[in-house]
């Protein structure tokens, strides 16, 4: 299928901080504060740095295998997990806060970008393997940061008396928002039906994992 694409400069989106825009633009003023700007050469340098700082891959493999235990996942995911045992495998990591209902589209963009970068790195450095890793930062935020989501012109706010790490919160009191979102969807449209199933089966259990796994 042919697709037309348009590249939009980060700065024109007005969705990123000046720090991020300057970093992507390789502003020399940032040089004293960073190790390197993103480039193929900097990726090669990072490979050499990581090779000098090995980790216990057996523990890494076991922990991630335990996290996936009992879940349905693709053969590619299984292959990637086993690749972690090799000293020639490196990870491309990205993370996101556990925003309700996935939060902004940027959540999906970050996952897609990590997958694409891992594939590009394999082309750049065919002697090595690269595994994209996405994880949720569930312990370092509060409800004020992640407790709302904008759908169209409406802002939905998680009304809860719970406190502490959001990753440990019970999602039962998201029921009113779930019902409001379900009312907006059409079960006769395949993509919308998929979202409805996610809301019904996941949110009220494992929505974020169910949403991100197919990506």
Give each language-model segment a name.
Residues 1-215:
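N-terminal targeting/trafficking signals and adjacent low-complexity tails
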């Amino acid at each position: 299928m042919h697709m037309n694409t348009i590249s939009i400069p980060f700065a024109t989106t007005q969705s990123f901080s000046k720090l991020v825009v300057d970093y992507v633009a390789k502003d020399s003023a940032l040089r004293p504060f960073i190790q390197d700007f993103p480039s193929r050469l900097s990726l090669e340098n990072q490979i050499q740095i990581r090779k000098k700082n090995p980790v216990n891959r057996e523990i890494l493999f076991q922990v991630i295998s335990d996290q996936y235990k009992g879940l349905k996942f693709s053969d590619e995911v299984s292959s990637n997990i086993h690749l972690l045992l090799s000293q020639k495998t490196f990870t491309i990591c990205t993370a996101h806060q556990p925003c309700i209902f996935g939060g902004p589209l940027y959540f999906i963009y970050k996952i897609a970008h990590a997958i694409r970068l891992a594939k590009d790195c394999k082309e750049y450095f065919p002697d090595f393997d690269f595994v994209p890793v996405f994880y949720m930062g569930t312990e370092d935020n509060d409800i004020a940061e992640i407790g709302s989501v904008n759908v169209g012109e409406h802002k939905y706010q998680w009304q809860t008396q719970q406190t502490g790490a959001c990753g440990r919160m019970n999602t039962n009191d998201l029921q009113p928002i779930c019902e409001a979102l379900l009312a907006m969807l059409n079960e006769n449209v395949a993509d919308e039906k998929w979202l409805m199933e996610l809301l019904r089966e996941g949110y009220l259990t494992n929505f974020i994992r169910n949403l991100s796994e197919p990506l």
